């Protein structure tokens, strides 16, 4: 007895195949969630970056943040009447102390200042060299020993972890502030001659700024404040006046930004405590 051939499969709906129907799980509709709508300006902790040349007053300005606690990596706060931890000498210690602050913020601490992010990056680099190996499992003696760009990618990952630690503090209602040194950086200009611009002294990435810790920090921050000495031009020559300004908006000469202000402040006209109010930086 000859068996008859099985009937052909039923045609799938237009635009779909029978096999796709079997393979594709049924889409689920998420449960409805009620919105929690608020209006007006919300009081929230802030992410702040202050950068400028050594000795210009970065630590002094940060010291007037409410309830400031310095994690002092280069003894920049020793002459200031602030709470500080000046014993951190490694990346592991720095991350561990931030974890302790997240777990149990000390009474009275409302702002955490890392002095400086430039030194913190060096600690991260030392940590990567000491703990990571190449793809062949070999130890290296310098960040370049990992191969082109690979070592700095590890440092970028470590520093991103530090920013995540600081985000946890912000979620608890604490302001966080990174101080940094300055560096002049060549900026390509397709419309004319290239020029130099002041930026925070952090790793800038490759030629296309991929893997840039500097750009990552800028994008992360609510405020990037540039402190600089004023220069006046007389008879075609620049002359320093000894006065200082705080820049909150970006210009060809520097990077800066603020979510709440767009002005230039005379650092010597106001006391440091009043500057935070003039910048409209909301502190919980």
Predicted region positions:
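Acidic, gly/ser/pro-rich intrinsically disordered tails
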Residues: 2-3, 284
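N-terminal pre-Walker A segment at the start of P-loop NTPase domains
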Residues: 3-37
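Conserved P-loop
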Residues: 33, 38-131
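Hydrophobic/aromatic ligand-binding patch that stacks against planar heteroaromatic rings
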Residues: 60-62, 168, 216-217
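Short, well-ordered beta-strand core segments
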Residues: 68-70, 176, 224-226
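Conserved, well-folded catalytic cores of nucleic-acid-processing
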Residues: 100-104, 123, 169, 220, ...
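P-loop NTPase motor core
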Residues: 119-213
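Conserved GTP-binding G-domain of TRAFAC-class P-loop NTPases and closely related GTPase folds
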Residues: 185-284
């Amino acid at each position: 007895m000859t068996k008859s051939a099985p009937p052909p499969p039923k045609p799938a709906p237009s635009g779909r195949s029978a096999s796709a129907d079997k393979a594709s799980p049924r889409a689920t509709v998420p449960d409805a969630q009620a919105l929690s709508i608020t209006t007006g300006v919300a009081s929230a902790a802030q992410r702040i970056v202050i950068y400028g040349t050594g000795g210009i007053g970065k630590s002094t300005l940060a010291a007037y943040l409410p309830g400031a606690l310095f994690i002092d990596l280069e003894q920049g706060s020793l002459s200031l009447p602030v709470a500080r931890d000046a014993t951190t000498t490694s990346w592991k210690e720095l991350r561990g102390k931030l974890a302790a602050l997240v777990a149990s913020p000390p009474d009275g601490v409302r702002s955490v200042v890392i002095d400086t992010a430039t030194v913190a990056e060096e600690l991260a680099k030392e940590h990567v060299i000491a703990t990571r190996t190449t793809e062949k499992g070999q130890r290296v003696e310098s960040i370049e020993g990992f191969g082109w760009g690979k070592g700095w990618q590890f440092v970028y990952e470590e520093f991103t972890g530090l920013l995540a630690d600081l985000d946890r503090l912000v979620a608890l209602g604490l302001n966080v502030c990174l101080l940094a040194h300055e560096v002049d950086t060549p900026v390509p200009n397709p419309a004319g001659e290239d020029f130099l611009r002041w930026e925070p002294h952090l790793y800038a990435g490759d030629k296309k700024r991929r893997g840039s810790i500097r750009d990552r920090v800028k994008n992360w921050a609510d405020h990037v404040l540039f402190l600089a000495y004023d220069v006046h031009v007389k008879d075609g020559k620049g002359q320093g006046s000894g006065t200082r300004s705080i820049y909150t908006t970006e210009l060809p000469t520097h990077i800066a930004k603020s979510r709440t202000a767009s002005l230039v402040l005379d650092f010597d006209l106001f006391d440091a405590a009043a500057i935070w109010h003039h910048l409209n930086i909301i502190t919980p």
